[in-house]
């Protein structure tokens, strides 16, 4: 497995990965109400994130296969962390998290994530704690979490 900076050519595969996992955090299986989310994970939107200086976007791949993707926004918010179902529970999320954490802004006091309810335990293992109640916004359910930027989680 190789972790590297995402390039615009990765956008199609990243978008497909995220869309394939969407049923795990959508409020409605049909996607009703999540139009804003869907707009934000199109290949064009992903290309914009990859190219924008506010984002640090990484992928994990093996040969030509994209296994996972992660993005840090503004040096302190874990914006995306998705692993293909066939490669979950193999340490890929942890490896991406380590690489993303290393890219955090030097002055960041904490890192945040809006965790999918089924991913809370994973983020807790990474050192995050729940900082607010479950929220439902734009057709998506999430739980706000925070981790100290300087602490070694794991």
What are these regions (language model features)?
Residues 54-68, 73:
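Conserved beta-hairpin
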């Amino acid at each position: 497995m190789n972790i590297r900076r995402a390039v615009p050519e990765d956008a199609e595969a990243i978008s497909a990965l995220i869309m394939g996992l969407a049923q795990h955090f959508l409020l409605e299986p049909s996607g009703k109400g999540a139009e804003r989310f869907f707009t934000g994970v199109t290949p064009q939107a992903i290309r914009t994130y990859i190219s924008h200086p506010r984002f640090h976007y990484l992928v994990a791949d093996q040969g030509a296969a994209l296994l996972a993707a992660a993005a840090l926004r503004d040096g302190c918010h874990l914006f995306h962390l998705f692993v293909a179902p066939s490669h979950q529970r193999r340490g890929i999320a942890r490896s991406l998290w380590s690489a993303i954490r290393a890219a955090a802004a030097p002055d960041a006091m904490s890192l945040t994530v809006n965790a999918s309810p089924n991913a809370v335990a994973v983020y807790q293992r990474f050192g995050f704690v729940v900082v607010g109640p479950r929220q439902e916004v734009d057709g998506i359910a999430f739980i706000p979490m925070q981790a100290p930027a300087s602490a070694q989680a794991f």
